[in-house]
């Protein structure tokens, strides 16, 4: 087995992409020589039957024996034993015509896959040039090579494009459509898709008609309806080109869904305008009734396509109820019903793209609830593979068809088309955004408007519609096709290659590479429920209200019909958590892992016993991506989504806790004691009060109703906060302790009475003013002699500010016990 050095970390050789191209082109040699293989002239044919196949051995070609005419008698026994009638047994033969069609299809798909591998091997090229541009270049080279050997290159037929290549891309986009971003911005998307496409078609068609009038003899015979038809073809944004470019630059979700949603939903407008102007071009006179019918056909085409898609989506979801015993065919129903929806819409000239999107969006939640996880993985990767191959073939065939098609070049018409396309796109985006921002909460910034206008790429849909034009009714279809190809190449090459550096230059927000956590998903749903309740209270019925209505209807009626078994009841999160724990415990018992778990059920004890265990040695292995995705899916489906009237509680219905008050008082005393010890240890006390000023009456917490109401028998103290002498806080030092420290003489009996009176019934600390002992005399403290050592020490302590105060030391003390 050959080993490639790139697998061990070494860069791949530069010649590797060239070798892939050479291998693909060598494989095309049978296709190039297919027209040169002819039947041997010696081979005879039987009338009304298939001609006999020629056989070859080495370089010698032999033909089947010539049959005798019917009128001539033949001796069968002689013919059987005659040595001239027998030929050597053919060991090897060549019959390319027998396998030509499937061989060429497989060869083109192989070429597309090899090209994708070759482009991504060299990161410098893939980081500068988009993949779509490189595929078109490969198509041009292959087309030129086929034409250089004298053969006719294949052309991208419109039937092949619309019936086989386009549906996988649209189904992949519709089935995995980010529904939340799409529904939240649906109004903006519809305005850009409908009004913007109409503006581009009529603006471009009118200006091109004016150019044709003054452009010269070659184009002055193109009428107004022909120019309007051309404008409707070239005005639509192509979803294939948008996907190919925007997936590589990783633009943020808002801009991506606006541009991509516009490219999906403008299909109805494009189909209606295309058929309308194509029919009007054959009329001698167009009346008002025809215009009204054409206007009504827009609603029929768009809404009819949505209806067809919804019907097939419901049928697919209902069918998936009965596939629990046959899991193998589950992915097949998704592909078949979606494709049938597209074909049914095209059968009635409805919008097939709208039908595919509607069917994918409708069937996905119910189908995924019924099918297994392996079937979901199969659907996901098969759709991604199918759409990627189709996209690659489209761009390659676009380059090949450019070489093979017939063109008619006119500088005036082509340059005017390119210039007016850019002007119409810019003016349309600016005008519509100015109107949309009046109603949006999150406004579209000028940077967003520039990216939306710059991301209007054209692609293979416009080419296929232009190729469908009949030369008998539209003699200038070659000129139209040349102008369409020019616009496609300009938007894909110039705009597609420069949009990445422009996004980096403008610092446009990009898409988050990491997936949202389960915590974020839970809080997102919580905010949705909260906004729904706010809308109900305000009486404003926004999209949250209608979304909740649809969810309730879906849970009550639709899920019971389309989802099988108990999965339609959507159990509560706690019940599901118990089921998950039970399942995990059963797995541990079966695997024999319970022997490693200690007998204690506490998680903390497990952490203490195995504090340094490596992640690989843990009992429970890490979750895989599939397991994590399954948990996300189950949580997303089982979270509470309904707005039920729960039991409301207030302070009158709550049961009182008998230990709550005692616990709060204990916390209050503990905090007061801690505050007292902190002040004494740091010598941080307020300056001594003047002897002629009474102290505060009480010190209580803020919740006490008597905190700021002095008693009647106590003097009222008025404190001016602006005065520098007003204390900022009340010292909570015990009066007895303070008196002992200062050496003050107090009457012991009097002091005991005051202590008895100062006791607060609720356990708080109370401070009272000193009442006079006799009328006319102020009972004040008698200080000790100033020359005593204790007095000198306390004066130094009071005058010295001490160490730096801690944070919050000078602020009033408010307990936090409550």
Curated annotation (Swiss-Prot):
Cytoplasmic side, ranges: 122-130, 177-186, 250-252, 323-328, 372-373, 439-444, 506-818
Chain positions found as Phosphothreonine: 603, 782
Interaction with PPP3CA: annotated segments: 684-687, 715-720
Catalytic activity: Na(+)(in) + H(+)(out) = Na(+)(out) + H(+)(in); Li(+)(out) + H(+)(in) = Li(+)(in) + H(+)(out); Li(+)(in) + Na(+)(out) = Li(+)(out) + Na(+)(in)
GO molecular function, one term: calcium-dependent protein binding
InterPro entries (UniProt xref): Cation/H_exchanger_CPA1 (IPR018422), Cation/H_exchanger_TM (IPR006153), NaH_exchanger (IPR004709), NHE-1-like (IPR001970), NHE_CaM-bd (IPR032103)
Residues recorded as bearing Phosphoserine in the entry: 599, 602, 605, 648, 693, 697, 703, 723, 726, 729, 788, 790, 799
Chain spans, region Disordered: 44-76, 741-818
Cellular-component GO terms for this entry: apical plasma membrane; basolateral plasma membrane; cation-transporting ATPase complex; cytoplasm; membrane raft; nucleoplasm; plasma membrane
Intracellular or extracellular location(s): Cell membrane; Basolateral cell membrane
Region of interest (Interaction with CHP2), residue spans: 515-545
TM segment ranges: 99-121, 131-148, 159-176, 187-215, 223-249, 253-283, 288-322, 329-341, 351-371, 374-404, 411-438, 445-469, 476-505
GO terms under biological process: cardiac muscle cell differentiation; cellular response to acidic pH; cellular response to epinephrine stimulus; intracellular sodium ion homeostasis; positive regulation of calcineurin-NFAT signaling cascade; positive regulation of cardiac muscle hypertrophy; positive regulation of the force of heart contraction; positive regulation of transcription by RNA polymerase II
Post-translational events: Ubiquitinated, leading to its degradation by the proteasome. Ubiquitination is reduced by CHP1. O-glycosylated.
Extracellular-side positions: 1-98, 149-158, 216-222, 284-287, 342-350, 405-410, 470-475
Region of interest: Confers pH-dependent PI(4,5)P2 binding: 540-545
Biased composition (Polar residues): 785-794
Keywords: Antiport, Calmodulin-binding, Cell membrane, Glycoprotein, Ion transport, Lipoprotein, Membrane, Palmitate, Phosphoprotein, Sodium, Sodium transport, Transmembrane, Transmembrane helix, Transport, Ubl conjugation
Region (PI(4,5)P2-binding region): 509-516, 552-560
Topology versus the membrane: Multi-pass membrane protein
UniProt key word Ubl conjugation: yes
Similarity annotation: Belongs to the monovalent cation:proton antiporter 1 (CPA1) transporter (TC 2.A.36) family.
Role, per record: Electroneutral Na(+) /H(+) antiporter that extrudes Na(+) in exchange for external protons driven by the inward sodium ion chemical gradient, protecting cells from acidification that occurs from metabolism. Exchanges intracellular H(+) ions for extracellular Na(+) in 1:1 stoichiometry. Plays a key role in maintening intracellular pH neutral and cell volume, and thus is important for cell growth, proliferation, migration and survival. In addition, can transport lithium Li(+) and also functions as a Na(+)/Li(+) antiporter.
Oligomer and partners: Homodimer; dimerization is crucial for its function. Oligomer. Interacts with CALM in a calcium-dependent manner. Interacts with TESC. Interacts (via the juxtamembrane region of the cytoplasmic C-terminal domain) with CHP1; the interaction occurs at the plasma membrane in a calcium-dependent manner. Interacts with CHP2; the interaction occurs in a calcium-dependent manner. Interacts with EZR; regulates the cytoskeletal interactions of SLC9A1 and promotes stress fiber formation.
Note: Predicted models used for more than 20 years predicted 10-12 transmembrane segments. More recently, the structure of SLC9A1 has been solved and reveals that SLC9A1 possesses 13 transmembrane regions.
Protein name per the record: Sodium/hydrogen exchanger 1
Annotated source species: Bos taurus (Bovine)
Gene, per the UniProt record: SLC9A1
């Amino acid at each position: 087995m050959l080993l490639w050095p790139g697998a061990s970390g070494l860069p791949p050789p530069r010649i590797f992409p060239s070798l892939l191209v050479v291998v693909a082109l060598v494989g095309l040699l049978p296709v190039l020589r297919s027209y040169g293989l002819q039947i041997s002239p010696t081979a005879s044919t039987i009338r009304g039957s298939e001609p006999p196949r020629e056989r070859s051995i080495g370089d010698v070609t032999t033909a089947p024996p010539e049959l005798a005419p019917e009128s001539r008698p033949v001796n069968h026994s002689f013919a059987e034993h005659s040595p001239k009638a027998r030929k050597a047994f053919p060991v090897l033969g060549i019959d390319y015509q027998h396998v030509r069609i499937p061989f060429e299809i497989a060869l083109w798909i192989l070429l597309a896959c090899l090209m994708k591998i070759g482009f991504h091997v060299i990161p410098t090229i893939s980081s500068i040039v988009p993949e779509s541009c490189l595929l078109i270049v490969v198509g041009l080279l292959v087309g030129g090579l086929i034409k250089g050997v004298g053969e006719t290159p294949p052309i991208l037929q419109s039937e092949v494009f619309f019936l086989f290549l386009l549906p996988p891309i649209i189904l992949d986009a519709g089935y995995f459509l980010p529904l939340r971003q799409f529904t939240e911005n649906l109004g903006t998307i519809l305005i850009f898709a409908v009004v913007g496409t109409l503006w581009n078609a009529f603006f471009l068609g009118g200006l091109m008609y004016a150019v044709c009038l003054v452009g010269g003899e070659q184009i002055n015979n193109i009428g107004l309806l022909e120019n309007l038809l051309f404008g409707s073809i070239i005005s639509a944004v192509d979803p294939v080109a948008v996907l190919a470019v925007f997936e590589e630059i990783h633009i943020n979700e808002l801009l991506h869904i606006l541009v991509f949603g516009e490219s999906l939903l403008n299909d109805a407008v494009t189909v209606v305008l295309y058929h309308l102007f194509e029919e009007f071009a054959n009329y001698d006179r167009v009346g008002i009734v025809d215009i009204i019918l054409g206007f009504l056909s827009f609603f029929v085409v768009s809404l009819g396509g949505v209806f067809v898609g919804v019907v097939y989506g419901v049928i697919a979801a209902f069918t998936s109820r009965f596939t629990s015993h046959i899991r193998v065919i589950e992915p097949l129903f998704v592909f078949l019903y979606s494709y049938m929806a597209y074909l049914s819409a095209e059968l009635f000239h409805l919008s097939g793209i709208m039908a595919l999107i509607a069917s994918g969006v409708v069937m996905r939640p119910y189908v995924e609830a019924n099918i297994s996880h392996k079937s979901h993985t199969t659907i996901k990767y098969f759709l991604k593979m199918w759409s990627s191959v189709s996209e690659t073939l489209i761009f390659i065939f676009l380059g090949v068809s450019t070489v093979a098609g017939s063109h008619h070049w006119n500088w005036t018409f082509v340059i005017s088309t390119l210039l007016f396309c850019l002007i119409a796109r810019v003016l349309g985006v600016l005008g519509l955004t100015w109107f949309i921002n009046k109603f949006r909460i999150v406004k579209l910034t000028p940077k967003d408007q520039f990216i939306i206008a710059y991301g209007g790429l054209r692609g293979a849909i416009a080419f296929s519609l232009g190729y469908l034009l009949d030369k008998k009714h539209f003699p200038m279809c070659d000129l139209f096709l040349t102008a369409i190809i020019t616009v496609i190449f300009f938007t894909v090459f110039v705009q597609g290659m420069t949009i990445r550096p422009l996004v980096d230059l403008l610092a446009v927000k990009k898409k988050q590479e990491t997936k949202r956590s389960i915590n974020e998903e839970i809080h997102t749903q919580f905010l949705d429920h909260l906004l729904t309740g706010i809308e109900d209270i305000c009486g404003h019925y926004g999209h949250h209200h209608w979304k909740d209505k649809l969810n309730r209807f879906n849970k009550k009626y639709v899920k019971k019909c389309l989802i099988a078994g108990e999965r339609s009841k959507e159990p509560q999160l706690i019940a599901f958590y118990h089921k998950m724990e039970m399942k995990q415990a059963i797995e541990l018992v079966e695997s024999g892992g319970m022997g490693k778990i200690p007998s204690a059920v506490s998680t903390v004890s497990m952490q203490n016993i195995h504090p340094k265990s490596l992640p690989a040695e843990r009992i429970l292995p890490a979750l895989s991506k599939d397991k994590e995705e399954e948990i996300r899916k189950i949580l997303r489906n089982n979270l509470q989504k309904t707005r039920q009237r729960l039991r409301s509680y207030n302070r009158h219905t709550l049961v009182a806790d008998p230990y709550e008050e005692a616990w709060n008082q204990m916390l209050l005393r503990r905090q007061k004691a801690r505050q007292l010890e902190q002040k004494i240890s740091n010598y941080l006390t307020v300056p001594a009060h003047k002897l002629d000023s009474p102290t505060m009456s009480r010190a209580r917490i803020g919740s006490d109703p008597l905190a700021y109401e002095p008693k009647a028998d106590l003097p009222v103290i008025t404190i001016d906060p602006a005065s520098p002498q007003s204390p900022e806080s009340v010292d909570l030092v015990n009066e007895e302790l303070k008196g002992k420290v200062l050496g003050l003489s107090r009457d012991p009996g009097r002091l005991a009475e005051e202590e008895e009176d100062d006791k607060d019934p609720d356990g708080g600390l109370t401070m009272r003013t000193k009442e006079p002992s006799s009328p006319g005399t102020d009972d004040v403290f008698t200080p000790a002699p100033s020359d005593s050592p204790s007095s000198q020490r306390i004066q130094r302590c009071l005058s010295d500010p001490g160490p730096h105060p801690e944070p919050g030391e000078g602020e009033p003390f408010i307990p936090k016990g409550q």
